[in-house]
Structure formats: C-alpha cells, structure tokens
Amino acid sequence: MAHKKGASSSRNGRDSNAQRLGVKRFGGQYVKAGEIIVRQRGTHFHPGDLVGRGKDDTLFALSPGHVRFGHRRGRRVVNVVAEAAVPA
C-alpha cells in the first residue's frame, strides 16, 4: 500500500451527522402520551412522575399533561403533571 498521498487525494473529507439531541418540549408545554421530551446520551435528566426512559436514555411522556422540570435528591428530573392537577 502507498504511504504517500497520490495526485489529488486528501486526508480530509469526513464529517458525521449531528445527533439532534436536547430538550424537545420545555417546561409548561403540553405533551401527549408517547411524546419525546428530551433526547440525550446518558442520564443528564432523570425520569420523574409519568415519564418513561428509553434504552437510549430518551425521556418520553407516559400520559398527557404539562412538562415540569425540577430537582430530586440532587438530580435534575422531568415530570409530567396531569391536566386536572395543573391550576388555570
């Protein structure tokens, strides 16, 4: 194999696609069951009430309601508050 580059070759030209991570639904926003709230690598946010966690650590709503971000035992958690419990 050649160890020197040939004519018009380059060692550059590679780039990976963005992973589109981050918060998808913000505090106070209404979500339906199954809607993705946060896409993440690792548990930056932990699931709280009425929130499930996928195998890739994605957080999603288990029932309809409003998103609430908070803290529990020093961890950042995401909760979904059911519609009836949210004051007008």
Curated annotation (Swiss-Prot):
Residues 1-21 are annotated as: Disordered. Disulfide bonds: none annotated. It holds the Pfam family Ribosomal_L27. Residues 7-19 have a biased composition (Polar residues). Transmembrane segments: none annotated. One of its GO terms (molecular function) is structural constituent of ribosome. GO terms for biological process: translation. PROSITE patterns: RIBOSOMAL_L27. Keywords: Ribonucleoprotein, Ribosomal protein. It comes from the Bacteria. Coiled coil: none annotated. GO terms for cellular component: cytosolic large ribosomal subunit. PANTHER family: LARGE RIBOSOMAL SUBUNIT PROTEIN BL27M (PTHR15893:SF0), RIBOSOMAL PROTEIN L27 (PTHR15893). Belongs to the bacterial ribosomal protein bL27 family. This is Large ribosomal subunit protein bL27.
